[in-house]
Amino acid sequence: MPEYQNIFTTVQVRAPAYPGVPLPKGSLPRIGKPIFSYWAGKIGDAQIGPIYLGFTGTLSIIFGFMAIFIIGFNMLASVDWNIIQFVKHFFWLGLEPPAPQYGLTIPPLSEGGWWLMAGFFLTMSILLWWVRTYKRAEALGMSQHLSWAFAAAIFFYLSLGFIRPVMMGSWAEAVPFGIFPHLDWTAAFSIRYGNLYYNPFHMLSIAFLYGSALLFAMHGATILAVSRFGGDREIDQITDRGTAAERAAIFWRWTMGFNASMESIHRWAWWCAVLTVITAGIGILLTGTVVENWYLWAIKHGVAPAYPEVVTAVDPYATATGVTQ
């Protein structure tokens, strides 16, 4: 009998194509016929399709493509419509927000209006996809853990691009679209406000980020390690602990001093992941609105040391008398 000894899926289970649960009356139909992919089966379910978008999903895709279209063509226009230069400099191209003098008004298209329009379409796309996530879970009788986790990520996105700029009174405070431009913005933002590493909510966000990465890795590794004992049947072992759950628990106690249960590990990971973006969003909203310089704030509250002033050397050639030559 095959055993799960590899970090990659070595056994693919092929069942007859399943179209999905019956749709409620009035729903849009599913699109396409189900197909099977060997390579998709290496990392997950081998069946692809049929796809159900529904009304909100279709609108989300349309708005998303409009945002990508606006951003892409503005990037292409910035290199004089040269496809070769577009590909060559793609990572450096961006769509910048309006200049500070425009405040929260609607600027001309060429001076930030396109950024505002792209941001609107992108935000609508994301919000509509959240509605789709909520409604699909509701239709399937599922709890809303995924939709609320997605909402936490949307809160962070809106904090950067909408809520904080409105609080600061200027769209110029928002993040540009583009790969390197948004990374440059992040570095400049941290320098401008006295180093974000001294922001306690940034500290919490990084702690939860590392924590969620560690928990997901530990959980995945543990379940793979006890899958030969039926550890992959986690739902069953939540209420009826078998040898896999017992072995996993005692291994955690031996190596960590405490252990999660088959149920609690998922809640730990969910909360760590959700709190990563919630604390990050709070830290962003406090920056510039409540705290102007995080380094000075850290010194005031005993988080960072107050470094003494260093005595500077005097250049004798810069003095009036000079020195003997």
Curated annotation (Swiss-Prot):
Membrane topology value: Multi-pass membrane protein
GO molecular function: bacteriochlorophyll binding; electron transporter, transferring electrons within the cyclic electron transport pathway of photosynthesis activity; metal ion binding
Subunit structure: Reaction center is composed of four bacteriochlorophylls, two bacteriopheophytins, two ubiquinones, one iron, and two highly hydrophobic polypeptide chains (designated L and M).
Name recorded for this polypeptide: Reaction center protein M chain
One cellular-component annotation, GO: plasma membrane-derived chromatophore membrane
Pfam families, per the entry: Photo_RC
Positions bound to a ubiquinone: 252
Source species: Allochromatium vinosum (strain ATCC 17899 / DSM 180 / NBRC 103801 / NCIMB 10441 / D) (Chromatium vinosum)
TM regions (residue ranges): 53-79, 111-140, 143-168, 198-226
Annotated GO biological process: photosynthetic electron transport in photosystem II
Localization terms from the record: Cellular chromatophore membrane
NCBIfam families per UniProt: pufM (TIGR01115)
Positions annotated to bind (7R,8Z)-bacteriochlorophyll b: 182, 202
Assigned protein family: Belongs to the reaction center PufL/M/PsbA/D family.
Binding of Fe cation, residues: 219, 234, 266
Annotated function: The reaction center is a membrane-bound complex that mediates the initial photochemical event in the electron transfer process of photosynthesis.
Coiled-coil parts of chain: none
Keyword set, alphabetical order: Bacteriochlorophyll, Chlorophyll, Chromophore, Electron transport, Iron, Magnesium, Membrane, Metal-binding, Photosynthesis, Reaction center, Transmembrane, Transmembrane helix, Transport
Top-level taxon: Bacteria
